[in-house]
Amino acid sequence: MREHLNHLHKKVQELPTTSGCYKMYSQNNKILYIGKAKNLRARVKNYFLKRISHKTKILMRNVANIEVITTNSEYEALLLECNLIKEYKPDYNIKLKDDKGYPMIRITCEKYPRIFKTRKIINDGSEYFGPYVNAKNLDLVLDLINKTFKTRKCKKKSKTPCLYFHMGQCLGVCYREDLEEQYKKEVDKIRHILNGKISKLLDETEIKMKEAIKKEDFEAAIKLKETKRSLIEISQTQIITRMNKLSADYIYIHQTDSLNAIVILKYKDGKLVEKDINFDESIYEEDELTAKFITQYYTALNMIVPNKIYIFKKIETENITKLINELKNTKTEIICEETKETIKIMEMAISNAKIALREYDNEKNRALESLKNILEMTKLPKTIEGFDISHLNGHKTVASLVSFKMGKPFKDGYRVYKINSLNNGEIDDLKAIKEVISRRYSKLINEQLALPDLILIDGGKGQLSAAYSILKGLKIENEVIVCALAKKEEIIFLPNKTQGIKLSKGNPALQILQNVRDEAHRRANSFNRTLRRNIKLNYSKIKGIGEEKAKNILKTLGTYKDILLLNEDEIAKKMKINIKMAKKIKKFSEDQNLKNTYSIKS
């Protein structure tokens, strides 16, 4: 098997064994092929066999990812496949010149409606039922309906009864005008059948079948048995296609202790055409998460808002609906209702959510396994701690610590440390790293707490050496692995290794390290922004100092302690202000420094 398919092959082993559709994507996230299966895992596995056709080999050379959508039955998978292929027109799927689609049953909107098979939808108020995959079964049921119910077949009026009237298959509405009420009852019965309410007709068919057997008319009995089976199959509610509905999204949130999967099943013209899954690590309850997600998701710039948004958790929707409709100039509705149809769609959403969460965890596990091998670790890096140093022009230096468990942020483990070993104005990242590593791991050792599996330092060889020297001093260099990740080149450095490790962009192992590094960087910058904002806002409390001038004081003079090192003349010269204002700034800084207006966790 080609090396670039190894990760896909592992993913296939974890696919569900239920029915559904699979989508094969290129490196550029373009859908190359869409297929359906009774057993997704078994079907997709076939693409990884040694003996596959030349065309399949060409396809698999271009496949970078595989996604699946589970369904409740093989029948629904077939309909979904049809809908998806029509929507996306993948390069490797068959392109039919005569893309006539599957047949439907149409009940016209005429005074005396006709009931017939069609493959085309006309928006004239007619009712459509289907589509149906097996045209033969559809023909059998239509034949049964035509023989059981005396419906109109003729397109035009006639002065004389038609052949169907003489055969007992028509009431004669083509030439009579007094049968509207009777005819309406016949059509209502047909609607009941097509909506799955067929028990009475099934009973009648069963009686006729038994009578045929008694008469030893086995040919008729076999035909009646086929009709009965076809009737049951065609009347089953198909949740993949909803011909009499407008476009709609169904949103389901599946929550676990550490992660939420938000599944959006998108229907277009009544057909399921897309599955969108978002992962969320927030700690909101389901109702609050539902409200926040809908607001953010549908107010995004390029998001197309459907006619209806169905949710499975009852929330207050009035303000959210108003906001979406005003911002997007739409008339959407947010609906929470429990019907037979929505329950079935929810079951499909739950299935896809569980698969997505399992796949997400499996992807993380594979990435951690890859990282373990790359760093030559003896165990999986289940717990990673990342560090970053930040300061304000050499002042207020802090170190941020972020913790990741199984590749996901563990926010209870986050810390921010005030660095005490540096003088005001002193910039020394190596010294800061030594201090924070010493403080962090001395505490863990003294309190007999578990060490992380991996420590990540934001920086290069110098920062790595500083951290490693402290670990050696604590005699834990063999108990925990430490590495550094340089920002620009994205090169991984390890102790006692002269050459760094350069991984390809998009490598899952590299992405885990980048996530840890970026989160540590974000945390440090976030703290410093808060600190900077507090200082700036405090400067603006000086009489005569506005927002812009307060910002300029911070930029030009620095923090309170920096200002204490200057006299009034120096302040006036640097800020280009008079002595009176310089004295105010100096006095204010002295007062604020005494209050010690900032605080840091340690």
From Swiss-Prot:
GO terms for biological process: nucleotide-excision repair; SOS response. Pfam families: GIY-YIG, UVR, UvrC_RNaseH, UvrC_RNaseH_dom. It comes from Borrelia hermsii (strain HS1 / DAH). Coiled coil: none annotated. One of its GO terms (molecular function) is DNA binding. PROSITE patterns: GIY_YIG, UVRC. It is found in: Cytoplasm. Residues 17-94 form the GIY-YIG domain. Belongs to the UvrC family. This is UvrABC system protein C. The keyword Transferase does not apply. InterPro entries: GIY-YIG_endonuc, GIY-YIG_endonuc_sf, GIY-YIG_UvrC_Cho, RuvA_2-like, UVR_dom, UVR_dom_sf, UvrABC_protein_C, UvrC. Interacts with UvrB in an incision complex. Residues 199-234 form the UVR domain. One of its GO terms (cellular component) is excinuclease repair complex. The keyword Transmembrane helix does not apply. It comes from the Bacteria. The gene is uvrC. The UvrABC repair system catalyzes the recognition and processing of DNA lesions. UvrC both incises the 5' and 3' sides of the lesion. The N-terminal half is responsible for the 3' incision and the C-terminal half is responsible for the 5' incision. Keywords: Cytoplasm, DNA damage, DNA excision, DNA repair, Excision nuclease, SOS response.
